[in-house]
Amino acid sequence: MIKQRTLKRIVQATGVGLHTGKKVTLTLRPASANTGVIYRRTDLNPPVDFPADAKSVRDTMLCTCLVNEHDVRISTVEHLNAALAGLGIDNIVIEVDAPEIPIMDGSAAPFVYLLLDAGIEELNCAKKFVRIKETVRVEDGDKWAEFKPFNGFSLDFTIDFNHPAIDASTQRYAMNFSADAFMRQISRARTFGFMRDIEYLQSRGLCLGGSFDCAIVVDDYRVLNEDGLRFEDEFVRHKMLDAIGDLFMCGHNIIGAFTAFKSGHALNNKLLQAVLAKQEAWEYVTFEDEAELPLAFKAPSTVLA
């Protein structure tokens, strides 16, 4: 049986909040089978839980938030959520003593290292996947995203920002997902932002944690970071990282082929909600026999060592 995964032990890290610029302590806790992914704000009394749920997602200019029925939110969840998807973590409680997850270096890599440091434990309960049975597509002007049936998890993403620095890079990235591929090819790709946007936001007391340490920063012509890019096509790789995190907001790894053109957090979420709302378009599946599991979700040696 392919089993659900959680952490072996509690781990903790500190970082800076993108919005406040203040220190945030992040604690990742193991959770029992069928708990799901739960984000928790411990700065509130009593603490408030935000279960990962496609319907709770709000996209802001700066980040992705989860919002509850009382309009309380937890911000900047997308990169940690991508790391959870990448390593196939089904059950976890994520605590922060702030309104936001720390931005770290703007990628998912610090979260991957933290999860691997905690160790991954299999629980004696079948892991549920969402399998796509029918094509579902959403559009917004010239932007679109779709899922098609596929026995694995593939992603094909194209960006078009009409910006000299971004146009000079390769703007399409496609891959067959696996934990190894995610860690090597996607997890280190950083978020990017425009200097003028960051300066404007900071002048209004927002994005106070925004810096060259946690993003690729571009002006109207070029990348401003002294160290340059981690990958020639880091921009599109990061958009794929975002999509992996967005699509894991249903709390389950997805078996299907994802293709997107100029999509972002909001459209990715719209696609996920469109899939889940169409009962005949998907089904839950479990695997008794590892031989039947799509290669995409085979546990890498580095994870279950």
UniProtKB/Swiss-Prot annotation:
Pathway: Glycolipid biosynthesis; lipid IV(A) biosynthesis; lipid IV(A) from (3R)-3-hydroxytetradecanoyl-[acyl-carrier-protein] and UDP-N-acetyl-alpha-D-glucosamine: step 2/6. One of its GO terms (biological process) is lipid A biosynthetic process. GO terms for molecular function: metal ion binding; UDP-3-O-acyl-N-acetylglucosamine deacetylase activity. One of its GO terms (cellular component) is membrane. Its EC number is 3.5.1.108. It catalyses: a UDP-3-O-[(3R)-3-hydroxyacyl]-N-acetyl-alpha-D-glucosamine + H2O = a UDP-3-O-[(3R)-3-hydroxyacyl]-alpha-D-glucosamine + acetate. The active site is at 265 (proton donor). InterPro entries: Ribosomal_Su5_D2-typ_SF (IPR020568), UDP-acyl_GlcNac_deAcase (IPR004463), UDP-acyl_GlcNac_deAcase_C (IPR011334), UDP-acyl_N-AcGlcN_deAcase_N (IPR015870). Its cofactor is Zn(2+). The keyword Kinase does not apply. Zn(2+) binds at residues 79, 238, 242. SUPFAM superfamilies: Ribosomal protein S5 domain 2-like (SSF54211). It comes from the Bacteria. Keywords: Hydrolase, Lipid A biosynthesis, Lipid biosynthesis, Lipid metabolism, Metal-binding, Zinc. Catalyzes the hydrolysis of UDP-3-O-myristoyl-N-acetylglucosamine to form UDP-3-O-myristoylglucosamine and acetate, the committed step in lipid A biosynthesis. Belongs to the LpxC family. NCBIfam families: lpxC (TIGR00325). PANTHER family: UDP-3-O-ACYL-N-ACETYLGLUCOSAMINE DEACETYLASE 1, MITOCHONDRIAL-RELATED (PTHR33694:SF1). This is UDP-3-O-acyl-N-acetylglucosamine deacetylase. It comes from Enterobacter sp. (strain 638). The gene is lpxC.
